[in-house]
Amino acid sequence: MAKHLFTSESVSEGHPDKIADQISDAVLDAILAQDPKARVACETYVKTGMVLVGGEVTTSAWVDIEELTRKTVREIGYTHSDMGFDADSCAVLNAIGKQSPDINQGVDRADPKEQGAGDQGLMFGYASNETEILMPAPITYAHALVKRQSEVRKNGTLPWLRPDAKSQVTFAYENNKIVGIDAIVLSTQHSPDIAQADLIEGVMETIIKPVLPAQWLSKDTKYFINPTGRFVIGGPMGDCGLTGRKIIVDTYGGMARHGGGAFSGKDPSKVDRSAAYAARYVAKNIVAAGLADRCELQVSYAIGVAEPTSISIETFGTGKVSEEVLIKLVRQHFDLRPYGLTEMLNLARPIYQATAAYGHFGRNEFPWEATDKAEALRADAGL
């Protein structure tokens, strides 16, 4: 039997890079709420005592960037200087300018359906039937651990927790089927007055055990809880944070390929984001239809051109029909032009800040997670 291990990681909403992502998407949402046709590319940098918000925006909306930034940081949980970052006292610098008219002329069209892609690029979407949400298990449970850390921090169950945390889960596979969890890493920022033994017990009993399925844990499973022994200095005081630096955490935890484009701070005309969402939608519907156990779709674009320059599909030997048939079905059932996919998934609205922590995929509140095309795909495939 073929055995292998596979590992994915996640980070909490208080991780510096995720603070940046959430601020960028908070700005995007605030603009889209007033101006759904806005062009937004918002980047954020955070470091001890400061936030820099920059980028290019074309919009009729007005947003109080400083207040929005402070509100976002406050909701994450950085509310006191003893954490090294305080929403009410940090400096907020605004360096937002206008989008280049050279880009606008390539994107805007008299016929909206012929809207060109905002840039060239390649994007991937992926789905797998190894979990109920049709996501890879390693990233799914890595997210669940840091999400649980946030919940028990905010509700006071473990009051000594602080916002910054990271998780990592290693799954064991035989013949591409999960047989157990080999290793778990969870590092969480904490107040200075908690003993290491109490921290380990609290994390194990309150975070790890309630989240990970018992049938995948064994006496051989390895646990690494705050393995350095101390994690008091964290967040932007420990490391600077930048928008778009957690692209594998945001997607499939390394189980699928990645085109390189980040998501946060970008409006739906940026295919880095919208086409990656559409590619997940397509791949998930193919797997939900039973046409493959695993599916990875690649789509690519040229700046200013509406039609994708390529569509390709890989089913890793699990397809019930040929990949050529799948591509034909995709072209028949999904409009992957920038305007088409924005309309198909109703993307021109303020839904993005919620995506900026704990993964963009595998969360059924988002429209690209619907499986409403599965039945029609299955019927047209003749299954």
Curated annotation (Swiss-Prot):
Task: Tell me if Signal is a UniProt keyword of this record.
Answer: no
Biological process per Gene Ontology, one example term: one-carbon metabolic process
Q: Which reaction does it catalyse?
A: L-methionine + ATP + H2O = S-adenosyl-L-methionine + phosphate + diphosphate
Q: Which residues bind L-methionine?
A: 56, 99, 239, 270
Pathway-wise, it operates in: Amino-acid biosynthesis; S-adenosyl-L-methionine biosynthesis; S-adenosyl-L-methionine from L-methionine: step 1/1
Residues engaged in binding K(+): 43
EC id? 2.5.1.6
**MF-aspect GO terms:** ATP binding; magnesium ion binding; methionine adenosyltransferase activity
Query: Mind telling me which InterPro entries this protein's record contains?
Result: ADOMET_SYNTHASE_CS, S-AdoMet_synt_C, S-AdoMet_synt_central, S-AdoMet_synt_N, S-AdoMet_synthetase, S-AdoMet_synthetase_sfam
What broad class of enzyme is this? Answer: transferase
Where Mg(2+) binds, per the record, is at 17
Question: Can you tell me which family this protein belongs to?
Answer: Belongs to the AdoMet synthase family.
How does it associate, per the subunit comment?
A: Homotetramer; dimer of dimers.
What name does UniProt use for this protein?
S-adenosylmethionine synthase
What's the source species for this entry? Answer: Shewanella putrefaciens (strain CN-32 / ATCC BAA-453)
